[in-house]
């Protein structure tokens, strides 16, 4: 393989150090390319199904695949039938693509064309779950032989369970940097902060010396301003935007 196994530890540590220094949206694509080259992979794909401040209908997708394959994949709506994406949205554990059911006609067509377009002979995916509902899937592919893949995939499983989350953190930093500032009142900030610490509306009201209905009003207006679907989501967005900090 391109990467000698005795260099894996160096590759891992160097990659972690680099990812921690990046924060711009353009850095995500650059980071994936560097990881691909450093680990001797065929391709890398990152799909964020849910991010603070971003609608489920507007997923973030960053890949190293060819432009032709990406265009075909979306033109033919292959994501709807992609068993890797489907499993990645409910699974908590990493999985090898060989574990995915490929019995369906549409699925066999998808994977057949993927190989033709150079996606890679083997693949592995790493589901990502954030503290406040953010959800993503990080995938790697390889063109190694079956024998070589069975030898190295355990090492990749070890490294990429961590690297996937570092890439996700980079995405969160990049997304935060591009979001327009949201202005919350001091009371809205206070209520959100205490909600983030697990307090109920009644408990927050007692802490702040205001009515429970007033507390709920502040939480609702904060949720609306942040474009959140609920208070938990509002807390996540407020943290990502550095509006609040959850510490006692």
Give the label of every model feature segment.
Residues 189-190, 233:
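Pre-recognition alpha-helix immediately N-terminal to the DNA-recognition helix
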Residues 64-116:
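Regulatory sensory and allosteric helical modules in signal-transduction proteins
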Residues 200-233:
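Recognition helix of helix-turn-helix DNA-binding domains
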């Amino acid at each position: 393989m391109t990467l000698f196994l005795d260099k894996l530890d160096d590759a891992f540590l160097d990659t972690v150090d680099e990812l921690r220094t990046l924060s711009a949206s353009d850095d995500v694509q650059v980071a994936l390319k560097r990881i691909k080259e450093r680990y001797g992979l065929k391709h890398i794909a990152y799909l964020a199904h849910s991010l603070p401040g971003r609608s489920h209908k507007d997923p973030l997708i960053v890949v190293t695949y060819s432009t032709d394959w990406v265009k075909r994949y979306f033109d033919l709506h292959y994501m709807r039938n992609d068993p890797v994406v489907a499993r990645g949205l409910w699974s908590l554990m990493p999985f090898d693509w060989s574990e995915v059911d490929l019995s369906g006609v549409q699925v066999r067509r998808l994977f057949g064309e993927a190989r033709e377009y150079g996606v890679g002979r083997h693949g592995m995916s790493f589901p990502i779950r954030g503290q406040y509902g953010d959800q993503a899937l990080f995938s790697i592919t390889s063109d190694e032989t079956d024998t070589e893949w069975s030898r190295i995939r355990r090492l990749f499983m070890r490294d990429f369970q961590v690297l996937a989350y570092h890439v996700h953190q980079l995405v969160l930093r990049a997304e935060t940097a591009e979001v327009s500032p949201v202005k919350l009142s001091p009371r809205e900030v206070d209520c959100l902060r205490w909600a983030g610490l697990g307090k109920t509306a009644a408990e927050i009201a007692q802490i702040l010396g205001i009515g429970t209905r007033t507390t709920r009003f502040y939480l609702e207006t904060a949720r609306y301003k942040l474009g959140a679907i609920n208070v938990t989501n509002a807390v996540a967005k407020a943290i990502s935007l550095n509006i609040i900090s959850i510490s006692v």
